[in-house]
Amino acid sequence: MAKDDVIEVDGKVVDTMPNAMFTVELENGHQVLATISGKIRKNYIRILPGDKVQVELSPYDLTRGRITYRFK
């Protein structure tokens, strides 16, 4: 899948789950299951419930995503 095919949306972390998984509520009200991208994991950026994040979604599976940025 090319990088151009992703859908980027903003959301808020609602819940944390085991294995660095998070439930994120998007701006349109949908909830997705998201993991942390490699660069966030490598730089030890902490993500807590209530944080505003940017999520990449694949057009093939809109229920799972990847957290690519945590807003300050």
From Swiss-Prot:
GO terms for molecular function: mannan binding; ribosome binding; rRNA binding; translation initiation factor activity. InterPro entries: NA-bd_OB-fold (IPR012340), RNA-binding_domain_S1_IF1 (IPR006196), S1_domain (IPR003029), TIF_IF1 (IPR004368). Pfam families: eIF-1a. It comes from the Bacteria. It is found in: Cytoplasm. Gene3D superfamilies: Nucleic acid-binding proteins. Its main location: cytoplasm. GO terms for cellular component: cell surface; cytosol. SMART domains: S1. Keywords: Cytoplasm, Initiation factor, Protein biosynthesis, RNA-binding, rRNA-binding. Residues 2-72 form the S1-like domain. SUPFAM superfamilies: Nucleic acid-binding proteins. Component of the 30S ribosomal translation pre-initiation complex which assembles on the 30S ribosome in the order IF-2 and IF-3, IF-1 and N-formylmethionyl-tRNA(fMet); mRNA recruitment can occur at any time during PIC assembly. NCBIfam families: infA. Belongs to the IF-1 family. One of the essential components for the initiation of protein synthesis. Stabilizes the binding of IF-2 and IF-3 on the 30S subunit to which N-formylmethionyl-tRNA(fMet) subsequently binds. Helps modulate mRNA selection, yielding the 30S pre-initiation complex (PIC). Upon addition of the 50S ribosomal subunit IF-1, IF-2 and IF-3 are released leaving the mature 70S translation initiation complex. This is Translation initiation factor IF-1. It comes from Lactococcus lactis subsp. lactis (strain IL1403) (Streptococcus lactis).
